[in-house]
Amino acid sequence: MSRILTLWAVPRSRSTAFEQMMRARGDHVCLHEPFGEAWYLGEDRRCPPQRSGGPTPGLTFASVWDDLQSRAAGSEPVFIKEFPHYVEHLCDDAFLDHFIHSFLIRDPARTLPSMYDKWPDFALAETGFLEQRALFDRLADRQDKAPPVIDAEDLVA
């Protein structure tokens, strides 16, 4: 299995624009927040209670991970854009070793109003800033160097 090229981001950080650029390259299998549906709608979902609807039968974090590993075993490299708060409960060293890590950051003063415009009733647990920072710090400590970080403002400068 090849390691999965991963952009760790938070909602409304211009991460989907980055993902679209990766898709346009045409040389990666690109997946949009593969664990997000399980976080919100999976049988073992972890989203805030006010977000929970009926679970999707058969959708679990394990089923998403199995699919992702199958894709990574294929002939094309895999890129995912993902939010750390969707997977923080999975992030042991063995899990993290499957990825090549990079981070996209955006000033919360820009991200939070954008979230509010899109989802006025969003919960703090959906912002992901604390989880993104915790994952970054953990990886920097593990690797003895910081993973690459892109400031979203640099993408539009």
Protein language model annotation of sequence segments:
Residues 1-73:
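PAPS-dependent sulfotransferase catalytic core
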Residues 80-157:
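PAPS-dependent sulfotransferase catalytic domain
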